[in-house]
């Protein structure tokens, strides 16, 4: 076993020993269906604490020939399938955690070289007799290995987008990284040596102009989770079972932590659900995820309508969002829709795929956004609060003219033109 090549199953073994483990191994039924096909390159993006690393470790444990995982998986859901053993521990797996590599590389500028050389060194140890001394890249080595042995690889990249997010202004490093990924996955040779590729991170694959930098990948995102919706977070049935086991109020859990609708399925934040099961306290666990510090600069961006849109969603409205212009990075914002699209990928907003509307999914996230805007002392939110107080006082005093005028004012200011005549937007104003 190596650090990159066939790392084994110990990481996933620790997950299985957790107090709460929700079985998501049926994802393997999907990957087993597409492995070795032209749909075998997958990018599954989701917010922090939605189980990305656990999934990556599960895939490595299942496919890696560097370990024996039969006993580990035979008692799980995937173990019931007739095809369970077909691909079990049959492949050379390359598993890369870019976040860890970035830290261990010493200088962030060395990250890509560190990853390439680390993989290449381990491939030479395992297959040195078929790799010429002139080969300088990991993907070049895999090409030679495949040509000589016929072996194919499962490549798993966890936190694939960390260099895109954390080094947003380092164009030289980003270009080097994108070129490395293209060498690994794009072209005729990669189709020969790749059995399966699985990238996971917060952001979808970076766009170059209007096209994905890796347009041969099937993307599953918070905008469109497709067939992987059930594996992105906890489902309604899974949460009901946990509430029963830990004697928690299901309706309260639903109010606090539900709200994402992915391909028609209710999806909950796993981190929050596990925390409330273990602690019994209904509170916001989101600020513990590490993305809160990135929220305030985003919502403070000077785009027309951004603050009004956020205040409108805090009050319960949905907002129309055009998601197609977002470049899948942290710097190329052209309008409020790009910012709102990023907030969807970060998990602060949910997205209704049918009507292309964004909304705040639950009480936990509403509190987070309220804290953020109040911390920044937005004039708009203070004005909104004053209007709400005036409306309340007018209602108590039975001043029907003022009540009508205030409702009309708030409805005009915090409801989009598209939604103005929608009864849900008016009910949100009244709420």
Model regions and ranges:
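Phosphate-binding site recognition
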Residues: 1-428
